[in-house]
């Protein structure tokens, strides 16, 4: 116990900002709806942080304060309520002599058929791919060139279990996190990148964790570091779980009548990866699985987008499967495998039986980009779009799980990527964009006849 406390104190001292050189305030807005949002801040000292916000160009500015303390790593959140739908808001956050400004847009009313644009990706700061001393995280400058409504940060927002250092890397990431101060330091390191800061101040961010926020391929109930990893994640993103379920991360939000997004937590409730697949094995847990099927089936939005940090059809994992797939490296489904395909297929069957149309899954994790059309039965199909990494080891496309009858429309490895989705009444267009900002592939799908 004494060694653990001493180590925690040392890490805290190493990563606390120096009093003589207070860093810029960190700000992110998330959980935006048509009438509300959550503003997250990190200050550089304990005490109040001032917030002013209002409709861009409007005559009125609301004022509020967020109290932060050392115990919370100087982080805090402020609910923004009674906002105007389909409006651009600007805000100013200040503490001491520091001040930063940002903006975001609110969603249109639920019945409005308003166009929407989003981007998604994941996997930031793996071994040998943390912040470059001169370039930082360059993909965020490419992201900033695309004017969108929000960013979906689809897991591996940090690599807590990777040490990254060297003369060409910004110091502060060369350790494996095991304590709450260390996990927070990992998040702070990524968020302090200048390009990340600027980008996160330009729009709203919806984030979800995957495995590296805690440890590679972890399963929540059986991992002793789940609680501290989850706490640090919640400390550093503008997420406000329900009061009666303070650990809950899965959620949904609607963007007009054309789009509803369902964000899954694929870690907190999962059975150990090493267990053979079977009726009792779960990635989502009973409550989240039922919520997902009922919410997607009950949605009246034209397009239903499900965010899964791990892919449906790409086999992953070392000694055991970590994604939904039970397929081997050649794409053939295997009996007695250790994936989660039975639960995946039960969810898809629930969607099909309840007439779900215009269904898209967004994923990351595998460090390559791919656009896939699945046709598991003759009368029903859906799409899976994968993007990434933001800055991590580069992967290559691999055989897909043939149990879903997939058709790869495009695949790209060996380069950092993100995906852009544009939804209009006429259809949905997806683009894969590389780190230079170049569009590598574009594909459009039209809405099916139903809702």
Where are each of the predicted segments found?
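Metal-dependent phosphoester/phosphodiester hydrolase catalytic core
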Residues: 22-451
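Bacterial N-terminal signal peptides
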Residues: 7-18
């Amino acid at each position: 116990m004494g060694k653990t406390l001493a180590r925690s104190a040392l890490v805290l001292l190493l990563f606390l900002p120096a009093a003589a050189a207070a860093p810029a305030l960190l700000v992110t807005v998330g959980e935006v709806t048509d009438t509300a949002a959550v503003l997250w801040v990190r200050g550089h000292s304990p005490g109040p942080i001032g917030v002013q916000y209002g409709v861009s160009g409007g005559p009125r500015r609301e004022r509020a304060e967020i109290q932060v303390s050392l115990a919370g790593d100087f982080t805090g959140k402020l609910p923004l309520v009674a906002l105007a739908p389909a409006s651009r808001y600007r805000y100013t956050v200040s503490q001491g002599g520091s001040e930063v400004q940002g903006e975001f847009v609110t969603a249109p009313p639920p019945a409005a058929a308003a166009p929407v644009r989003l981007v998604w990706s994941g996997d930031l700061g793996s071994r040998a791919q943390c912040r470059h001393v001169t370039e930082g995280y360059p993909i965020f400058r490419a992201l900033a060139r695309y004017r969108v409504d929000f960013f979906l940060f689809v897991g591996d927002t940090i690599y807590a279990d990777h040490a990254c250092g060297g003369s060409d890397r910004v110091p502060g990431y060369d350790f494996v996190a095991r304590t709450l101060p260390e996990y927070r330091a990992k998040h702070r390191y990524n968020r302090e990148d200048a390009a990340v800061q600027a980008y996160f101040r330009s729009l709203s961010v919806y984030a979800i964790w995957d495995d590296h926020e805690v440890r590679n391929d972890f399963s929540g109930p059986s991992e002793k570091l789940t609680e501290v990893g989850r706490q640090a994640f919640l400390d550093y993103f503008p997420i406000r779980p329900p009061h009666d379920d303070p650990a809950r991360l899965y959620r949904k939000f609607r963007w007009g009548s054309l789009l509803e997004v369902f964000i899954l937590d694929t870690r907190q409730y999962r059975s150990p990866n090493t267990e053979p697949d079977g009726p009792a094995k779960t990635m989502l847990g009973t409550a989240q699985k039922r919520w997902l099927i009922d919410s997607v089936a009950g949605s009246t939005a034209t397009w239903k987008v499900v965010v899964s940090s791990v892919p449906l059809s790409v086999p992953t994992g070392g000694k055991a499967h970590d994604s939904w797939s039970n397929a081997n490296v050649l794409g053939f489904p295997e009996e007695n495998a250790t994936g989660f395909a039975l639960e995946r297929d039960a969810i898809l069957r629930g969607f099909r039986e309840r007439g779900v149309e215009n269904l898209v899954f967004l994923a990351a994790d595998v460090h390559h980009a791919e656009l896939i059309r699945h046709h598991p039965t003759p009368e029903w199909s859906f799409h899976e779009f994968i993007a990434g990494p933001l800055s991590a080891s580069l992967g290559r496309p691999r055989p897909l799980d043939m149990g879903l009858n997939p058709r790869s429309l495009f695949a790209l490895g060996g380069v950092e990527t993100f995906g852009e989705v544009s939804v209009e009444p006429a259809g949905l267009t997806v683009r894969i964009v590389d780190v230079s900002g170049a569009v590598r592939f574009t594909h459009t799908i039209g809405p099916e006849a139903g809702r």
